[in-house]
Amino acid sequence: MERLTSPPRLMIVSDLDHTMVDHHDPENLSLLRFNSLWEHAYRHDSLLVFSTGRSPTLYKELRKEKPLLTPDITIMSVGTEITYGNSMVPDHGWVEALNNKWDLGIVKQEASNFPELKLQAETEQRPHKVSFYVEKSKAQEVTKELSQRFLKRGLDVKIIYSGGMDLDILPQGAGKGQALAYLLKKLKTEGKLPVNTLACGDSGNDAELFSIPDVYGVMVSNAQEELLKWHAENAKDNPKVIHAKERCAGGIIQAIGHFKLGPNLSPRDVSDFLEIKVENVNPGHEVVKFFLFYERWRRGEVENSEAYTASLKASVHPGGVFVHPSGTEKSLRDTIDELRKYHGDKQGKKFRVWADQVLATDTTPGTWIVKLDKWEQDGDERRCCTTTVKFTSKEGEGLVWEHVQQTWSKETMVKDDSSWII
């Protein structure tokens, strides 16, 4: 959050499974649409928050499976853990707040008296969360009796049932809603209260997100029965909460447009990259647009036309240099020429490209340095390059690519880098 010196224009707080991530979309198209929109229009002045019921272990597994962006803040284990940035630094103030009237030993002891409760995997048992599976028909009765037992033992806990089978026991002060309220209070104290906040969810454990004052909310079209029921009983007359017509990340994009929170046209929704126009000079957008074109070129989804090559060359400095991850230097214009022979080589294959953490710095008047992680998925193999791009600009002439340098990220183990083009 340190990169922002003023209040974020927008803070998106989104659940992951079946909200940001559509597990019924093998190509991850809606997620990739959101990624392109966020990196080109929001990353530089907004905050992305993932709020998931997953433990850190399962969250990291999901990151390996899906093309998720790197969030600024991660809320895990149903609002009981808050971490910041790439390195996921824990919020110790939140940990202290959750210790009030909470005793993990007593919680486990009382829950063991209910044979209906089946303990979830060890990775899902956290310092402030105990998780079980329970049949839907028995959930209400078990929840009621458990609550009474905890009250008699002097504990102040909450029980959340979601997904038609998950039962989580947390401190009363925990949960996705309380974690969001805590974050908003913290940001306000720092003078960085977001101009707008959009909460996004699909299941019962997301309901609390929509109860926070002055927060917009979207239930994606595939929202579960328990969340729709909560909405009907508690928020049906609230114009700030909508039930989207689109699934998952598509519903989030729809909500951005519905509430007029900012741009809602993803670069992936524009069929011809030459038609993508931006009112102001935006180096981050140029990078997102180029790598989207690169993906479409190799998938054979754009015509093998001289117009595209000419357009690319016109945006590159005649002396522009590309430093390959192997350390080899070559001309940027030669790299564009080389790209021509790869047209359609990934047609019909699972080949996707996305940019993450796109951050542009205006170093001197007319010069920008853009840093990002460029990801490439080819079948089941994923590779990432830390990429630095230098742009220059002359008034009225747009941006010119001067220098591109790539190095393999820590997550990427490469035996042969000859197949990496740019």
Swiss-Prot record:
Cofactors, names only: Mg(2+)
GO BP: any one term: sucrose biosynthetic process
Enzyme class: hydrolase
Keywords of the record: Hydrolase, Magnesium
Assembly description: Homodimer.
Catalytic activity field: sucrose 6(F)-phosphate + H2O = sucrose + phosphate
Record protein name field: Probable sucrose-phosphatase 2
Recorded superkingdom: Eukaryota
Keyword hit for Repeat: no
Gene3D superfamilies: 3.10.450.50, 3.90.1070.10, HAD superfamily/HAD-like
Function noted in UniProt: Catalyzes the final step of sucrose synthesis.
Keyword Oxidoreductase: no
Transmembrane regions: none
Entry GO terms, CC: cytoplasm; cytosol; endoplasmic reticulum; nucleus; plasmodesma
Protein family per UniProt: Belongs to the sucrose phosphatase family.
Pathway linked to the protein: Glycan biosynthesis; sucrose biosynthesis; sucrose from D-fructose 6-phosphate and UDP-alpha-D-glucose: step 2/2
Record InterPro entries: HAD-like_sf (IPR036412), HAD-SF_hydro_IIB (IPR006379), HAD_sf (IPR023214), NTF2-like_dom_sf (IPR032710), SPP-like_dom (IPR006380), SPP_C (IPR013679), Sucrose_Phosphatase (IPR051518), Sucrose_phosphatase_pln/cyn (IPR012847)
EC number annotated for this UniProt entry: 3.1.3.24
GO terms for MF: magnesium ion binding; sucrose-phosphate phosphatase activity
